[in-house]
C-alpha cells in the first residue's frame, strides 16, 4: 500500500450548521495544518460583521468580498479552509476550490442544520419567518453545487467534530493522489 500524503490544501464546503468551522479546526489539528474560516477572514479584513456587510452591501457585495478572500485563501499551502455556505454559488469560487485543493462536502440534513443554527443571529440568510423552509430552499439550490465541486462527501450527523474529522481523513486516504 502506498504511503498517504496529507493534502496541502483542504477546503470544506457545505450548508450553514454543517460544522465546517468546528470540524475544520479538528481536521487541521489532526493533520498539522493551519485552520482558516473564510467568513472570519472577511470580518477581520473589513472590521465589521457578516450581517453588517449584508445590510449595507447586500448579498452581492458580500459575495464579491467572499470571492476575493477565497481566491487568496485557496492559494495558500498547509491549510484547511472552511468556506461560507454560499461560497459555491459563485462559479469562480467553485473553479478555484476544485483546481487548487481537495474539497470536502460536509453534508448535513436540514433538521440538523436547524437544530445547530436556531439561536444564531449572525446568519443573515436565516433571518426569516420560516428558517426551516429557508434552509430547505438553500440546500435544494446548493446541494448540487456542493456535490459538483466535492472530491469527497462526509455526513456530519451522528458524531462529535473529532470523529467527523477522522472520517474525513479516512475518506481522503481513499482518494487517488
Curated annotation (Swiss-Prot):
<keyword id="KW-0963">Cytoplasm</keyword>
<comment type="function">
    <text>Catalyzes the specific phosphorylation of the 3-hydroxyl group of shikimic acid using ATP as a cosubstrate.</text>
</comment>
<feature type="binding site">
    <location>
        <position position="39"/>
    </location>
    <ligand>
        <name>substrate</name>
    </ligand>
</feature>
<keyword id="KW-0418">Kinase</keyword>
<keyword id="KW-0808">Transferase</keyword>
<feature type="binding site">
    <location>
        <position position="85"/>
    </location>
    <ligand>
        <name>substrate</name>
    </ligand>
</feature>
<comment type="similarity">
    <text>Belongs to the shikimate kinase family.</text>
</comment>
<dbReference type="GO" id="GO:0004765">
    <property type="term" value="F:shikimate kinase activity"/>
</dbReference>
<keyword id="KW-0028">Amino-acid biosynthesis</keyword>
<dbReference type="InterPro" id="IPR000623">
    <property type="entry name" value="Shikimate_kinase/TSH1"/>
</dbReference>
<dbReference type="GO" id="GO:0009073">
    <property type="term" value="P:aromatic amino acid family biosynthetic process"/>
</dbReference>
<feature type="binding site">
    <location>
        <position position="142"/>
    </location>
    <ligand>
        <name>substrate</name>
    </ligand>
</feature>
<comment type="pathway">
    <text>Metabolic intermediate biosynthesis; chorismate biosynthesis; chorismate from D-erythrose 4-phosphate and phosphoenolpyruvate: step 5/7.</text>
</comment>
<dbReference type="InterPro" id="IPR027417">
    <property type="entry name" value="P-loop_NTPase"/>
</dbReference>
<keyword id="KW-0547">Nucleotide-binding</keyword>
<feature type="binding site">
    <location>
        <position position="123"/>
    </location>
    <ligand>
        <name>ATP</name>
    </ligand>
</feature>
<comment type="subunit">
    <text>Monomer.</text>
</comment>
<feature type="binding site">
    <location>
        <begin position="17"/>
        <end position="22"/>
    </location>
    <ligand>
        <name>ATP</name>
    </ligand>
</feature>
<dbReference type="GO" id="GO:0008652">
    <property type="term" value="P:amino acid biosynthetic process"/>
</dbReference>
<feature type="binding site">
    <location>
        <position position="160"/>
    </location>
    <ligand>
        <name>ATP</name>
    </ligand>
</feature>
<feature type="binding site">
    <location>
        <position position="63"/>
    </location>
    <ligand>
        <name>substrate</name>
    </ligand>
</feature>
<keyword id="KW-0067">ATP-binding</keyword>
<keyword id="KW-0460">Magnesium</keyword>
<feature type="binding site">
    <location>
        <position position="21"/>
    </location>
    <ligand>
        <name>Mg(2+)</name>
    </ligand>
</feature>
<dbReference type="GO" id="GO:0000287">
    <property type="term" value="F:magnesium ion binding"/>
</dbReference>
<dbReference type="InterPro" id="IPR031322">
    <property type="entry name" value="Shikimate/glucono_kinase"/>
</dbReference>
<dbReference type="Pfam" id="PF01202">
    <property type="entry name" value="SKI"/>
</dbReference>
<dbReference type="GO" id="GO:0005524">
    <property type="term" value="F:ATP binding"/>
</dbReference>
<keyword id="KW-0479">Metal-binding</keyword>
<dbReference type="GO" id="GO:0009423">
    <property type="term" value="P:chorismate biosynthetic process"/>
</dbReference>
<keyword id="KW-0057">Aromatic amino acid biosynthesis</keyword>
<dbReference type="InterPro" id="IPR023000">
    <property type="entry name" value="Shikimate_kinase_CS"/>
</dbReference>
<protein>
    <recommendedName>
        <fullName>Shikimate kinase</fullName>
        <ecNumber>2.7.1.71</ecNumber>
    </recommendedName>
</protein>
<dbReference type="GO" id="GO:0005829">
    <property type="term" value="C:cytosol"/>
</dbReference>
